[in-house]
Amino acid sequence: MRTKIIAIIPARSGSKGLRNKNALMLIDKPLLAYTIEAALQSEMFEKVIVTTDSEQYGAIAESYGADFLLRPEELATDKASSFEFIKHALSIYTDYESFALLQPTSPFRDSTHIIEAVKLYQTLEKYQCVVSVTRSNKPSQIIRPLDDYSTLSFFDLDYSKYNRNSIVEYHPNGAIFIANKQHYLHTKHFFGRYSLAYIMDKESSLDIDDRMDFELAITIQQKKNRQKIDLYQNIHNRINEKRNEFDSVSDITLIGHSLFDYWDVKKINDIEVNNLGIAGINSKEYYEYIIEKELIVNFGEFVFIFFGTNDIVVSDWKKEDTLWYLKKTCQYIKKKNAASKIYLLSVPPVFGRIDRDNRIINDLNSYLRENVDFAKFISLDHVLKDSYGNLNKMYTYDGLHFNSNGYTVLENEIAEIVK
C-alpha cells in the first residue's frame, strides 16, 4: 500500500492573469486556504507543504496548518517549470515515496475528491500517476488556430457531418496530480499509459486564472454558503416545530422530505396519520438529526418512507449512501416497533428541473428496488409519469413538488396498501 505521501501546494505570488490571486479573499478566507484545508481534512497525507516565493504566502500557509518551503530565487519566476519546483520540494522532503500536487487555483476540489483520488492511486498500483480530469465542452477536432489574416482557413472539418456528441473527450483540470516520486523524476510529467484518470464534475473543476474566473468562484461559493446555512436552519426550525408529532404515535407514520411535509393529511382510509416529513431534508440528515438522536418515540403499524430526491443533489452523493441511511433508519423503526410494516416509496420523476435528472432518479430507483430487503419497495412510476417519462405536469406546480392532484394520486396509492 502506498502510504507515505506528501501534499505539495504550489503558490507563486507573481501571477500574470490575476495579481496575487492566491492571497485574494474568496468570501471568508484566502484562495490558498481552500486547498490547504481540503488536503488536511482528507487525512491522506503525512505532510502538507506550500512551496512559494512569498513570505506572505508562507504566513498564510502556516496560519491554516500547513508547512511552507521558500523557493530559491531561480525558481521564483514565471519561467520556472512545475517540474523544477516539485523536484526542489522532493529534494528537501526525501522521506516520501509518492506526492500529490494540489494547485490552489482549484478551490472546489474538496477533501472527498482528494480521498477518492488517493485511494485510486493506492489500490491500483500498476499505475504510477493519477490525474484529475473533467469532460471537455468543446471537442479538440474543432479547435484550430487563426491564420495571419484572421480567416478560418485552418477550420477544414466537414461541418455538415460534424456531431459534437460523437466523441467524448477529457482534459486535465489542474486540481489533483498524484505520482510515484521516482517515476515522475524520470519522466518529468504525469501522463501516459501508466497514468489513470480521476473524473471530476464541471463545477468542482473550476480553475481560477483571471478576474472573471475569480468572480465566478465568488458566485459559486456564495451559493454554496447560502444553501448550506439557509437549508440547515430551515431544517432544524422545522424539526423543532414538529416536536409534538415526534412524541405522538398514529397507525400510519410518514417519514421523509417536503413531499410529505407539504401534505396536509390527517387520515387515510379513516386511519390516523402522523406526518413526520421535514422539508429540505435528505436521508443522511434525517438519520443524523432525528433517528440517531431518537427523537421519534414510536412508529405506527404502517410506515411510509419518502427519500432520494434531496440525496441526488448532494455533492459527491452515491447510491450506496442512500441505501445505507435507509437501512439504518429502518433498523431503528424495527427497534421501536417490530410489528411495523415499512414501505419505501420510489423517488418521483421531475418535470423540467435543471437541478434534478430523471435518468439519475431512474437509476436510483432501480438500485433501491434491487437492493432494499429491509422494506417493501413501492414504485409510483405508473401513476406519476407522463408518456415521456417525466412527472406529469398535472400533478405539480414547480416540476418537483406535488399539487392537490399529485397528492390525490399519492393518497390513493397509500390507501390501497393500508385498506
Swiss-Prot record:
InterPro entries: CMP-NeuNAc_synthase, Cytidylyl_trans, Nucleotide-diphossugar_trans, SGNH_hydro, SGNH_hydro_sf. It catalyses: an N-acylneuraminate + CTP = a CMP-N-acyl-beta-neuraminate + diphosphate. Transmembrane segments: none annotated. Its EC number is 2.7.7.43. It is found in: Cytoplasm. Optimum pH is 9.0-10.0. Inhibited by the CTP analogs 5-mercuri-CTP and CTP-2',3'-dialdehyde. GO terms for cellular component: cytoplasm. It is an enzyme of class 2 (transferase). The keyword Transit peptide does not apply. It holds the Pfam family CTP_transf_3. Its cofactor is Mg(2+); Mn(2+). One of its GO terms (molecular function) is hydrolase activity, acting on ester bonds. Keywords: Capsule biogenesis/degradation, Cytoplasm, Magnesium, Manganese, Nucleotidyltransferase, Transferase. Catalyzes the formation of CMP-N-acetylneuraminic acid (CMP-NeuNAc), which is essential for the formation of the capsule. Monomer. May form aggregates. Belongs to the CMP-NeuNAc synthase family. This is N-acylneuraminate cytidylyltransferase. It comes from Escherichia coli O18:K1:H7 (strain RS218 / NMEC).
